A protein has these predicted regions:
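Extracytoplasmic
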Residues: 7-39, 258-263
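C-terminal transmembrane helical hairpin of 12-TM major facilitator-type secondary transporters
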Residues: 310-357
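Helix-loop-helix hairpin linking two adjacent transmembrane segments in secondary transporters
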Residues: 150-199
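Central cavity-lining transmembrane alpha-helices of secondary-active solute carriers
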Residues: 49-64, 282-295
C-alpha cells in the first residue's frame, strides 16, 4: 500500500471521534443525571471539571511513556483503560453511595478523574505517532487529519447521544460507548506499529517518501537528525515551547467550555428539550470540522509559500484567535438564538483553524522529544479542562451565562499574546 500512513491517520480519526463522544456524552445526559442525584449548578460544574485533574497527569505520563515504550504501548493501554472506565460510569452514583458514605458526587468525581487519566495520553501520543510517520513537509496536514476527529466527534455527539437518550437510559449509553472503544483497541493492535519501518504494509516507496527531507526548511528537524540527548526539563528553557503551551491553553479553555456547557446553556437560557439538542448541539461544531482540516493545509501552504515557520504557525494561530475572540465578545449582547448559534459556530471554527499548529510547533522544534514535550505541554494546557467547566459553573451561578463567553474572550487574548513569542523550529535555546 503506497499510502498506508493515511490509513493509520484514518484509524486515529475514528479513535478521536469515539474519544470525544465519550467526553461529550455526560453533557447531554446531564438533565437525567442531575434529576436523579439532585446536583446543583456548582456541583455539576465540579463533576465536569474532575475530568481535567486526571487528564493533566494522564497527558504528562502518556507523553513520557510514548517516548520510552513507544506509542503503540500507550495507545493500547490507554484505550483499554478509558473504555472500561466509560462502562463503569454507568454505575458512578451507586459506587459513590456504596463506598463514600452515600455521596453520589464522590463516585462521579472518582470515575471522572480515572477517565481523565486514561484519556490524557491520547493527543501527545498522536503527536509522537505523527513525528514517527510523517515527512516534515506534511506535518501540518497529518496533524490536522489526526485532530479532525475532535470537532467531528463533538459534532456527531449531539445527534447520536440525544437520539439515544430519547429511547434508552444514560447508563446503557455509557456501556455501549465503552464497548466501541474496546473494539477499536483490538483492531489497532493488529494494524499499527511504532515506526513505518516495522510495518509490513508500508512499501519501500512510501518509506522513502516519509523519510525524505526534500522541501524541508533549514530550521526543521527530523527524527534522525535531532539531538536525542535533550532532557525533559529543557522544555522550560525554551520560549518557543513555553509560549506555544500557553497559546494552546487558550484554545483548550474555549474548546472545553463549548463542549461541556453548551447543552445546559441552551436548556437553561432558551428552554430547549433534549430532543431539540440533537441538531442545536451540532451547530457550534460544523465550521470547526472544516477549519480543523483546512487549517493544517493552510499552515503547510504558508510554510511552503513563505519559507517562514513563524508566519505559517504563530501568526496563523494569532489571526484565528483574534477572529474567534471577536465572535465570542458579541454573543453576550445578542438575544437572538439564531445569531447566537451562528456566532458560536463561526467563533469555534476560528478556534480550531490553528488547532494543528500547536502540535506542529513541537514536532518542528524537537521531533525526538515529541512525546515527552507533548506530554508536558498537554499537562499544563489541560489545567483548562478543570478551570473551564468549574469556573463556568461558578460564573453562571453568580453572574449568569454572559460571563461564560467573556471568559472565552479572555482565554483567546491570552493565547494571542503568548503566540507572539513563538518562533517555531529555531535552534532550541535549552542548552545555551
Amino acid at each position: 500500500m503506497k499510502r498506508y500512513r493515511y490509513f493509520i491517520i484514518t484509524m486515529i480519526v475514528i479513535m478521536t471521534m469515539i474519544n470525544y463522544i465519550d467526553r461529550g456524552a455526560i453533557s447531554y445526559a446531564q438533565e437525567d443525571i442531575i434529576k436523579e442525584f439532585g446536583f446543583d449548578t456548582i456541583a455539576w460544574g465540579s463533576i465536569l471539571g474532575y475530568f481535567g485533574y486526571g487528564y493533566m497527569f494522564g497527558s504528562l505520563l502518556g507523553g513520557i511513556t510514548a517516548d520510552k515504550k513507544g506509542p503503540k504501548f500507550v495507545w493500547i493501554l490507554a484505550g483499554t483503560a478509558w473504555s472500561l472506565v466509560e462502562i463503569a460510569m454507568a454505575f458512578a452514583g451507586e459506587l459513590g453511595m456504596a463506598i463514600f458514605g452515600g455521596s453520589a458526587i464522590a463516585g462521579f468525581g472518582l470515575l471522572r478523574v480515572l477517565f481523565g487519566i486514561s484519556e490524557g495520553p491520547i493527543f501527545s501520543t498522536i503527536s509522537k505517532t505523527n513525528a514517527n510517520w510523517a515527512a516534515p513537509r506534511e506535518r501540518g496536514l497529518l496533524s490536522a487529519l489526526g485532530l479532525i476527529g475532535v470537532p467531528l466527534g463533538a459534532l456527531i455527539t449531539a445527534p447520536i447521544v440525544s437520539g439515544f437518550l430519547t429511547i434508552a437510559s444514560w447508563r446503557l449509553l455509557f456501556v455501549i460507548l465503552g464497548i466501541l472503544g474496546l473494539v477499536w483497541v483490538i483492531i489497532w493492535a493488529k494494524v499499527f506499529t511504532d515506526y513505518p519501518e516495522d510495518n509490513k504494509k508500508v512499501s519501500e516507496e512510501e518509506l522513502n517518501d516519509i523519510r525524505s527531507t526534500n522541501e524541508s526548511l533549514n530550521v526543521e528537524k527530523t527524527v534522525e537528525t535531532e539531538d536525542s540527548s535533550e532532557k525533559w526539563y529543557h522544555f522550560f528553557k525554551s520560549p518557543i515551547l513555553v509560549g506555544n503551551m500557553i497559546g494552546y491553553f487558550g484554545f483548550q479553555y474555549v474548546n472545553f467550555l463549548i463542549l461541556t456547557w453548551t447543552p445546559k446553556y441552551l436548556q437553561d437560557e432558551y428552554h430547549f428539550e433534549i430532543h431539540s439538542l440533537w441538531y442545536l448541539g451540532m451547530i457550534p461544531w460544523i465550521g470547526a470540522c472544516f477549519t480543523a482540516y483546512f487549517g493544517g493545509q493552510m499552515s503547510d501552504w504558508l510554510r511552503k509559500k513563505t519559507g517562514n515557520l513563524r508566519i505559517a504557525r504563530s501568526y496563523f494561530a494569532i489571526a484565528g484567535m483574534i477572529c474567534a475572540a471577536i465572535c465570542f465578545l458579541i454573543i453576550p449582547f445578542t438575544h437572538s438564538i439564531v445569531a447566537v448559534m451562528i456566532l458560536m459556530m463561526i467563533g469555534n471554527a476560528f478556534i480550531f483553524l490553528p488547532n494543528a499548529v500547536y502540535w506542529s510547533v513541537i514536532i518542528d522544534t524537537a521531533p525526538n522529544k515529541t512525546g515527552t514535550y507533548g506530554g508536558i505541554t498537554h499537562f499544563f494546557v489541560n489545567t483548562a479542562t478543570v478551570i473551564a467547566p468549574t469556573l463556568t459553573g461558578i460564573l453562571v451561578a453568580t453572574h449568569g451565562y454572559s460571563t461564560m463567553f467573556i471568559s472565552a474572550v479572555v482565554a483567546s487574548l491570552i493565547s494571542i499574546i503568548a503566540m507572539c513569542f513563538v518562533r517555531p523550529g529555531e535552534k532550541n535555546m535549552s542548552r545555551h
